Regions:
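Conserved SAM/SAH cofactor-binding pocket of Class I
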Residues: 54-129
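Class I SAM-dependent transferase core
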Residues: 1-67, 100, 104-114
Length: 129
C-alpha cells in the first residue's frame, strides 16, 4: 500500500484565522489550570496542533455530525468546528476537568455547532444505539 500525500491545506478566511488564534489563546490560558495538551504557548499550539488539525478538513463529510473521541482540549474537534460551522461536532472526553475547561472555551468562542460531553466512548456509543 502506497502512502498518499496529505491533501493541500484549505486557505482559511481572515475571520476563521482570528477565531482560531482566539482558540489558541484560550487554550493556552486553560492549559495553565488544567493540562489539556502538551505545549502551553500560543505559537507552539498553533504550529504543532492547530495547523495539523486543518489537514483533516478535506476529509470531513459534507453534512452530519462528527465525534471527536478523547478531545482533551478540543483538538481536532474545536478547530474543525470553527472551520466548518455547517457541521455539528460532539467533543467527547471521559475526564470532567478537561470537559469543564473545554466547555468554557467553546462558550467563549460562541460555537453553537460544538457540544462538549463528559462520557466514556463506550457509554456514548451505547447511549446512541
Amino acid at each position: 500500500m502506497e502512502i498518499q500525500p496529505l491533501p493541500p491545506l484549505p486557505e482559511p478566511s481572515a475571520k476563521t484565522v482570528t477565531q482560531l488564534r482566539r482558540y489558541a489563546s484560550l487554550l493556552a490560558v486553560a492549559n495553565e489550570r488544567v493540562r489539556l495538551t502538551g505545549p502551553y504557548d500560543e505559537e507552539t499550539l498553533w504550529t504543532d496542533h492547530i495547523e495539523d488539525c486543518l489537514h483533516v478538513l478535506p476529509l470531513l463529510p459534507p453534512s452530519g455530525t462528527v465525534v471527536d473521541v478523547g478531545t482533551g482540549g478540543g483538538l481536532p474537534g474545536a478547530v474543525l468546528a470553527v472551520c466548518r460551522p455547517d457541521l455539528k461536532f460532539t467533543l467527547l472526553d471521559s475526564l470532567s476537568r478537561k470537559t469543564k475547561a473545554l466547555a468554557e472555551i467553546i462558550a467563549a468562542l460562541k460555537l453553537p455547532n460544538a457540544e462538549v460531553i463528559c462520557m466514556r466512548s463506550e457509554d456514548f456509543a451505547a447511549a446512541r444505539r
